[in-house]
């Protein structure tokens, strides 16, 4: 399973993810990548996008971040 940063890269980068998630800007996606988590506002949309693009992520790590990093 990928972390948030790896998932964003796997889906084509911040530009692509920002275009595919309504309401998300490139800056927001860059923040997700650096924080390695997605906030509650876009959490479900991010998981849906990962599912559509067949990118496997751990939902708990998407919401809370990877505590080991």
Each PLM stretch: what is its role?
Residues 2-7, 15-16, 26-31, 40-44, ...:
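Short, charged recognition helix plus adjacent turn
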Residues 19:
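Alpha-helical residues within the helix-turn-helix
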Residues 22, 34:
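Residue-level detection of the helix-turn-helix DNA-binding "recognition helix"
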């Amino acid at each position: 399973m990928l972390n948030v940063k790896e998932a964003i890269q796997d889906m084509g980068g911040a530009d692509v993810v920002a275009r595919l998630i309504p309401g998300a800007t490139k800056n927001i996606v860059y923040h997700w990548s650096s924080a390695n988590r997605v906030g509650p506002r876009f959490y479900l949309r991010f998981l849906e996008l990962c599912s559509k693009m067949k990118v496997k992520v751990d939902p708990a790590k998407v919401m809370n971040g990877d505590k080991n990093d």
